[in-house]
Each structure stands twice: as structure tokens, then as C-alpha cells.
Amino acid sequence: MLLRWHSVIPLFLAMTVAFPNTYRTVVEDLPAIPEGWVQGNPPSPETSVRMNLAVGQQNTRTFEQIVLDISTPGHRNYGKHLSRRDLKGLLRPRRETSNLILSWLEKSGVPKRSIVDDGDWIHFVISISQAERMLQTRFYHFHDVQDPGISMIRTLKYSVPSRLARHVYMIQPTTKFGKPKKHANSIANLQAIYLSTNATENCNATITPRCLRELYKMGDYVAKPDCRNVIGVSGYLDQYARYSDFYKFLELYAPEMKGANFSVAHIGNGQNLQNSTRNSIEASLDIEYALGLSNASAVFYTTSGRGPLVPDLDQPEQEHNSNEPYLDQLHYLLSLPQEALPAVLSTSYGENEQSVPERFSHATCNLFAQLGARGVSVIFSSGDSGVGSSCLTNDKKKITRFNPTFPASCPFVTSVGATFKINPERATGFSSGGFSDRHSRPGYQNDAVQHYLDKLGDRWKGLYNPKGRGIPDVSAQGANFAIYDHGKVIIVSGTSASAPAFAAIIANLNAIRLRANKPVLGYLNPFIYGKGREGFTDIVHGGSKGCVGYSSTNRSTPAVPYASWNATEGWDPVTGVGTPNFRILAKIVQHME
């Protein structure tokens, strides 16, 4: 039997009586069950869960400044990316901090053999009954309203002994309910259109790799595969990249890339089934354009979702197969030696920022920064809900608010919005953007974003955070992409298309730098807002939409008449600084120190 959110209040009141907070500090506390989820029954007490504990860091600002220095052209440390050993040494907490946490875990009954001390993170496997005693909480199955077959074992609140409060920043999976969404268009409601394979190419109607090459001044440039220049593509939610579809796409739309291929990395029992009948439009789109434009070496990182599970110590039961994919993928990547890391990572998934617990968003953003420190360009699509979909806060206040997206709102990723049409390009109505409510505006954005805010004036005052990190950073075509999936040509739209297209251009720029014996670009944003700015074409037409009175789940929500971020001269929160001009960017990066 499923329980609506208002039914669980007595349960959690009873829980606080059973577990008094004497000498304990609450780490995370959700005001209610997040929208779209209902509570079910408690899990079996013997159910095992794999927990990730983020250790409180004392030198976060110092670390972030190091990342900025490494990534800012002209700085004496530019391009001096850190090795895994150097990064771990920089972030490792004091020994007494680790000892306190490890002692608490062992005294709480966590099997010593299951504990992995990775410095700034500690991972361990524990039963539900032990976790409930240790965190003084109750776990339940929570079910997705739209897809009741999807469930997660979660809680709304947990605490730790007060003596550990400053050492334990976060423990997950506990309060993180949201699941990444594929960034497929949700405002214009474009449907997949099936075409014949000999459709005439018209770049105003259908985008192909050749269209992007012409539009972004790439010409016939084809990079030579280089093991130092790997482009990674993220795969979540049982999206499978099919080799047969990929080869056919190259034959149809990028014959100059014949021979290109990709390998697969399986994270947390993630699979890449070649004969599945499931929709794989997202995976096909991402891998086909990442490689169809770059010819780089490529890896498809498939992270476990709802597919079949092969039990192991970390995931002994099918019902445990609800791990947080961002954390699983990030910890996997950061564990790799330098030579095995991708130089570019493209991800076309995200969720509303407010659906993510605040500590989770900061801890995850720190992991993205760690990838940047090691020389990875982390690229995310900005989302497909324009200024916002529900436009309502999910706290007790329930006020009208534009909805920024995460992880696009993290200052250490490069977020990509969407354009359409050519001569001129225009901002699409669905391209997400705005200003983070969690992450403050980074210094590299100050001039560009403030210029926009000065022109905006009081319009939309109170609906966004003018001091927040601006989204997106850049943009690229995102409408009417031809892909090949399940033996058919399909037309798809969304910032899901923009991200791999932009990532491919970055991979090509990396190839130019490596040929000149220079390091890869790594974390991009200081470059984009600095020396690279002249390599982007400003988009001044079009604008985003949103807040139309109903959410993506068709629930009634506040409407904001004419809500929009307009594309204007300079940076704007729908197209960023603009779309890339490869010819100019290539000249800049070739000699950049």
C-alpha cells in the first residue's frame, strides 16, 4: 500500500520520539516527500545498502582557487593538471578526522571489510537495520508516481553524533530522491519523426554533422585518434549505445569518420545491451554526434539504473539497484589513473536544482571540480524547460520561482543551451537557463552576467537569484537532429543534442593542442569567459519560454505571463556567450599558454 506524503508525518513524529536528538546533530532534513514520489513499505531490515560519506573539508576555497588557476590561460599554473595522487593528497582530511569517522562506523556495526577510505569520501556497506540505528532514522521504499515500477530506499531525515557533525558533510543515498532526466524537448512537445534514409539535407529543417561543420566553421577538419584525447559520453537510465546504429549513422551522415568506434565502461553493473527493444534515442544521439564530429577515441560510460543486476557485495539485492548515478560515475572516473581519464565528458541529463538536497549539490559539484583539476572538460546540457516548468518552490513557502537546473548550475561544469535555425541562429524556446539558487556567481562570470543584469533591470525581480551562477555558458544547435536508432532515421530535439556537438568541438581543439605539444583544455569556463570569448558568435535573436501554468507532469502550477529569458547582445541566460566558431577557437588554443 502506498502512502501519500501527508500520511508520513505521524510516522516521522513517532520516529523522533523513538530516537531522541540528545547529543546528535541533524545533517539533512527534508520538509516533505519530494513531488512525484509516494511512500511505500519499509525495506527488509537485512537489506544491504552501499553508503557514500562525504567528509567535511576545511580547505574547499583553497582547492577551488587551485582549480581556477590551473584552468585560467595566462596563469603560471595553467595546464598543470593534477595527478590522482596529488589531488588526493590535497584533499585528504586530517588523520584524526578520518579516525573519528572510521571508529564511529565500526562501533555502529559496519563490517570493517566493507569500508573503503578514499580520503575525502568513505564508502561502506551496511544493513538497513544498522543504518537506521546509526543515523537514527527510518528508511522506506519510495515509488515514482509516474512509473511505480521505479522505487528507491530513502529517508527524509538523518543525524550523526554531535561530535562528528563538522566531520560528516553528507551521507547518501538517504535524502536524494530525484533521478536524472534525459534532456528531450518538453515545451515545444516535438515528437520523433521517422524519415527515409535518403532525405534531402536542408540545414534549416534537419541538422546533420555536415550542417554543424559548415555552421561552426569546422570545414573538413578530422582529428587523428589519440589515446590522450578521449571523449566520454555518459549513459544513464538503461540507455544503450548500439554499434549497428552507430555504424549506419556514420555511413549516412559522416562517411569521412568511417572506422571510428567506441568502447564501453560498465559502472556499477551498468549494461549496454545490443538487442534490447528499449528506447535508446538519448544514447544514440550522444554517441553519434560526439564521434560523428570529432573522430576522437571514445568511451560510453554506462552507469547502472533499472536494468538486470548481477549481485555482489556492494549490490547484493535487486532492490538495492537504486544508486545515485552521478556519484557512482564520478567516483569511478576519479579512481582512474591519468592516462585512463577522458579529456572531455559529455552528459545530457539533469534535474531541477531544487529537487536535489543542497549538500548533495555542493558535494557533487566538488567532484566535478576534481575532474577539472585533473584536466577533464565536464560538459552538461542546460535542460529543456526554458525559464522553468513547475515554477514553484518545493519548500514550505511554495512561492512562484523560476527553476534553474542541476548539474548545469555547478560552476565547475560547462553548461550548453540550444539554438535553432541558421543565418541567423536563434535561441530555442525550450533552452533552460537562469541563475542558481545554490551556487554563487563565480568571478569569471562577473562582468558578463552583470552586463546582462544591468540591462534587465527589475524585470522578473523576485523570481530568480541575481547573485547566482548564470546558466548556460555557451550554446549550440539543438533542434531537429537526424540520428539513427533501432534501424530508423529519427529527428530529435533538445539540449541533449547541443552538449555532444559542443563536446566534439572541444575534442577537436584538444587535438590541435596536443599536436602542438600543449596540454588539453581541461575545465573550460575561465577560458570561455576570458581569452576564448572572441571565438564565440553572439546570439541575439529568440528567447526561452516557460512557467505556462502546468508542470512537466501536467499538474497545475503558477503561470507567469510572457516568462522568458531573451537572447541579447553579450551573455544571456538562454544562449550563454554564444555558439562556437571552430576556426577562430583553433587559432586561439594553438598558441595559448
Curated annotation (Swiss-Prot):
<feature type="active site" description="Charge relay system">
    <location>
        <position position="282"/>
    </location>
</feature>
<protein>
    <recommendedName>
        <fullName>Probable tripeptidyl-peptidase SED3</fullName>
        <ecNumber>3.4.14.10</ecNumber>
    </recommendedName>
</protein>
<feature type="active site" description="Charge relay system">
    <location>
        <position position="286"/>
    </location>
</feature>
<feature type="domain" description="Peptidase S53">
    <location>
        <begin position="206"/>
        <end position="592"/>
    </location>
</feature>
<feature type="glycosylation site" description="N-linked (GlcNAc...) asparagine">
    <location>
        <position position="204"/>
    </location>
</feature>
<dbReference type="Pfam" id="PF09286">
    <property type="entry name" value="Pro-kuma_activ"/>
</dbReference>
<feature type="glycosylation site" description="N-linked (GlcNAc...) asparagine">
    <location>
        <position position="554"/>
    </location>
</feature>
<feature type="signal peptide">
    <location>
        <begin position="1"/>
        <end position="18"/>
    </location>
</feature>
<feature type="glycosylation site" description="N-linked (GlcNAc...) asparagine">
    <location>
        <position position="566"/>
    </location>
</feature>
<keyword id="KW-0865">Zymogen</keyword>
<dbReference type="InterPro" id="IPR000209">
    <property type="entry name" value="Peptidase_S8/S53_dom"/>
</dbReference>
<dbReference type="GO" id="GO:0005576">
    <property type="term" value="C:extracellular region"/>
</dbReference>
<keyword id="KW-0645">Protease</keyword>
<feature type="binding site">
    <location>
        <position position="538"/>
    </location>
    <ligand>
        <name>Ca(2+)</name>
    </ligand>
</feature>
<keyword id="KW-0479">Metal-binding</keyword>
<feature type="active site" description="Charge relay system">
    <location>
        <position position="496"/>
    </location>
</feature>
<comment type="function">
    <text>Secreted tripeptidyl-peptidase which degrades proteins at acidic pHs and is involved in virulence.</text>
</comment>
<feature type="binding site">
    <location>
        <position position="570"/>
    </location>
    <ligand>
        <name>Ca(2+)</name>
    </ligand>
</feature>
<keyword id="KW-0378">Hydrolase</keyword>
<feature type="binding site">
    <location>
        <position position="539"/>
    </location>
    <ligand>
        <name>Ca(2+)</name>
    </ligand>
</feature>
<dbReference type="InterPro" id="IPR015366">
    <property type="entry name" value="S53_propep"/>
</dbReference>
<feature type="glycosylation site" description="N-linked (GlcNAc...) asparagine">
    <location>
        <position position="261"/>
    </location>
</feature>
<dbReference type="Pfam" id="PF00082">
    <property type="entry name" value="Peptidase_S8"/>
</dbReference>
<dbReference type="InterPro" id="IPR036852">
    <property type="entry name" value="Peptidase_S8/S53_dom_sf"/>
</dbReference>
<dbReference type="GO" id="GO:0008240">
    <property type="term" value="F:tripeptidyl-peptidase activity"/>
</dbReference>
<keyword id="KW-0843">Virulence</keyword>
<keyword id="KW-0325">Glycoprotein</keyword>
<keyword id="KW-0106">Calcium</keyword>
<dbReference type="GO" id="GO:0004252">
    <property type="term" value="F:serine-type endopeptidase activity"/>
</dbReference>
<dbReference type="GO" id="GO:0006508">
    <property type="term" value="P:proteolysis"/>
</dbReference>
<feature type="binding site">
    <location>
        <position position="572"/>
    </location>
    <ligand>
        <name>Ca(2+)</name>
    </ligand>
</feature>
<dbReference type="InterPro" id="IPR030400">
    <property type="entry name" value="Sedolisin_dom"/>
</dbReference>
<keyword id="KW-0732">Signal</keyword>
<dbReference type="GO" id="GO:0046872">
    <property type="term" value="F:metal ion binding"/>
</dbReference>
<keyword id="KW-0964">Secreted</keyword>
<feature type="propeptide" description="Removed in mature form">
    <location>
        <begin position="19"/>
        <end position="198"/>
    </location>
</feature>
<feature type="glycosylation site" description="N-linked (GlcNAc...) asparagine">
    <location>
        <position position="295"/>
    </location>
</feature>
<keyword id="KW-0720">Serine protease</keyword>
<dbReference type="InterPro" id="IPR050819">
    <property type="entry name" value="Tripeptidyl-peptidase_I"/>
</dbReference>
<feature type="glycosylation site" description="N-linked (GlcNAc...) asparagine">
    <location>
        <position position="275"/>
    </location>
</feature>
